[in-house]
Amino acid sequence: MTLFNLTDLASTLPRNARLIGLDPGSKIIGIALSDVGRRLATPYGAMKRGKLAEAAATILDIARKEGAAALIIGLPLSMDGSIGPAAQAARDWAHAIARETGLPVAMMDERLSSAAVNRALIEADVTRAKRAGRVDAAAASYMLQGALDLLNEPRPEE
């Protein structure tokens, strides 16, 4: 299955279908979920990054349980916007997840999402131990919210 750009993905979605945001790290995958109006992202949880088939099964279970119709996967572009090794690995994983789950997938720039989330948690005086368990899902939520904001921007009339 091919990857969609965000706008094309939105035009294929059924009404009131949620989106799942995934922030794939080297060890943990952060998970976030949109509301049915696709306006608000919330942290959902995290899972260990293991075998592809297991990750795909977990993602499909969440999609069925929560009424999600597509995935938005974080793309860790380099600071200059280029595709480095981490972004290429995320793209390869996104293609594999799309193929395994059969769900449509779009990718979203996630530069500095973990840093922004860490900074917010530090400002909220969350201890380092508690931050460790929350950053992945919060980073997925931060990235998904960025995608939702783009999808909800008014478009100029053609």
From Swiss-Prot:
Localization, UniProt: Cytoplasm
GO biological process terms on file: rRNA 5'-end processing
CDD domains for the chain: YqgF
N-terminal signal peptide: none
SS bond list: none
GO cellular component labels: cytosol
Domain of life, source organism: Bacteria
One Pfam family cited in the UniProt record for this chain: RuvX
Ranges that cross the membrane: none
A GO MF term: nuclease activity
Keyword entries, A-Z: Cytoplasm, Hydrolase, Nuclease, Ribosome biogenesis
EC number: 3.1.-.-
Family: Belongs to the YqgF nuclease family.
PANTHER family: POLYNUCLEOTIDYL TRANSFERASE, RIBONUCLEASE H-LIKE SUPERFAMILY PROTEIN (PTHR33317:SF4)
Functional summary from the UniProt entry: Could be a nuclease involved in processing of the 5'-end of pre-16S rRNA.
Name of the featured protein: Putative pre-16S rRNA nuclease
